[in-house]
């Protein structure tokens, strides 16, 4: 995969009403190259998370496209030089972060520390619905209630 290859992304520049035709924009961007502890994941499925809807409510206009998508499932297609837990070909799922482009794109860089192998008994679509909600439930059950 060369650095000059393009991928499809879906994002927004301005938090418009969802029924506005410009509320989401299809664009093309370069496929990123992983470094350090990053995985490059070919995204197979995503879910809509409450975090996505909250981030969309930002009414400011920005110069850069904002790509949402907090939860995702896909196949690892490249790894950074410090990655230890995953290999090319692994099917993974993850909850993203608000500091990076989200999963509403064909390929996504994800830090291996927020990734897990996707459950084999779930479809991509089913697994995509789990990451952040599972973490929230875990925190409630084991960190709050002990």
Question: What residues fall within each predicted segment?
Answer:
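Eukaryotic N-terminal low-complexity, Ser/Thr- and Lys/Arg-rich leader segments
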Residues: 1-8
